[in-house]
């Protein structure tokens, strides 16, 4: 009976695994590339949010096949936006990048474009994103745990400012810089923001842009977790910066996606087992897409998208990057757009100096082991 139950659970989980697995990347070693470059299979959840002229507006992170988390400030007055995925290497001669039309944007209802409080937004793609080695979802904590999981290898990723473009970012290959949380922070913070600092001596330029993700690994699981979205600072390395704490918005995310559909997978039981039990009880490679939140923001826009084009130039526009890619975006017909608040670009991403690369854990869990671990936890919990 137990074996039959386990097999049924396995089949059920496999049937939903495309949306349940998160925080796993193919890269298994620390790539010691020059200038803190990110290898092609690292950070497969980072996307570029662009307007219809293919101008880069902000970064975002994939939470599921349909949902992306980004900043509200960069998405005001943007009637048509797309998500370009698999952006670790933007060289069109080597990589063909897929675009997905965004048909719904849900900014936080209390977003303040003056103070930049609650600067967070959900984006829903019109069609499901196809996951592969270059495109995956990242995990995030589905609630505030009594004992938060220990994290390691925290990085911020972004485009690299160059002398040729000044403060503008050059879209080529993502860079990464090691960062750490700071308990005593001299910066003025809003509620639900945290303070962090670059960790190494000043050698390289810093990476700062709206929505630049701060990503860490959970020590017990080696799964990647979206810790935050860059909010302010990062002009110099080493230096302080603020980021929007994603964990503080987990209930909001769950509620919004549940109401808009499809809802994000909520695995709070497994999250509790994995993160709150002693290590010998929780040393399981469980992927926790801990998301969800409700209440619909008053900014549910529908967007249409034009054709996919090949990357040919990096012309700057609106202090962003202008580029084209090769395929037709996953899209449907246009629909009317609601009136949006005034657009406010709050972060210029000025170049600084310094930074370094944090090491990356070498352990890589196969999906088969993850699925089996999930079933073992399920059976052991008596659910």
Curated annotation (Swiss-Prot):
Residues 305-334 are annotated as: Disordered. Residues 1-20 form the signal peptide. SMART domains: Tryp_SPc (SM00020). Disulfide bonds join 154-216, 185-195, 206-237. InterPro entries: Peptidase_S1_PA, Peptidase_S1_PA_chymotrypsin, Trypsin_dom. The keyword Hydrolase does not apply. One of its GO terms (cellular component) is extracellular region. Glycans are attached at residue 113. Residues 323-334 have a biased composition (Polar residues). One of its GO terms (molecular function) is serine-type endopeptidase activity. PROSITE patterns: TRYPSIN_DOM (PS50240). Residues 21-258 form the Peptidase S1 domain. GO terms for biological process: proteolysis. It is found in: Secreted. Keywords: Disulfide bond, Glycoprotein, Secreted, Serine protease homolog, Signal. Pfam families: Trypsin. Belongs to the peptidase S1 family. Plasma kallikrein subfamily. This is Inactive serine protease 54.
